[in-house]
């Protein structure tokens, strides 16, 4: 269910949003990043993903988001659970008047780049970066770098050894 902008603004101002991030890895271990057009994280490199809609099952959200963000509809079984994360932004999709708080369910997808049909609706450019490069690149948003940096405390329900284990897989 998509909401009118005023209703959505009230929700973003008042409560966390639930989203799915798609950590897409190619055969060389590089991660797909898109340069964000929209707020929050506008102008930063970030993994694809998006919100879970009201009354939408996670499986359906995953399929919808892979189609919208990667250009190919994929079942949830393609993704490997990569933890639950918390993302905080000082702005929101409508402007800078209030912050945005996401609870993010992340999935790792190992895909061949040639099957992707990357759209330009959310990102104006794409690149593949190694984990080592993206961790040290300030143009990659902090919340995205956190997926590969075991020193952050942004994973919920995972301790550092679990994050390290996920990063090596």
From Swiss-Prot:
Subunit annotation: Homodimer.
UniProtKB keywords: Hydrolase, Lipopolysaccharide biosynthesis, Magnesium, Metal-binding
Binding site for Mg(2+): 49, 69, 122
Known pathway: Bacterial outer membrane biogenesis; LPS O-antigen biosynthesis
Cofactor note: Binds 1 Mg(2+) ion per subunit.
GO molecular function: GDP-mannose mannosyl hydrolase activity; metal ion binding
Gene giving rise to this polypeptide: wbdQ
Species of origin: Escherichia coli O157:H7
Binding positions (substrate): 2-3, 8, 36-38, 51, 64, 102
Domain of life the protein comes from: Bacteria
This protein's name: GDP-mannose mannosyl hydrolase WbdQ/WbhG
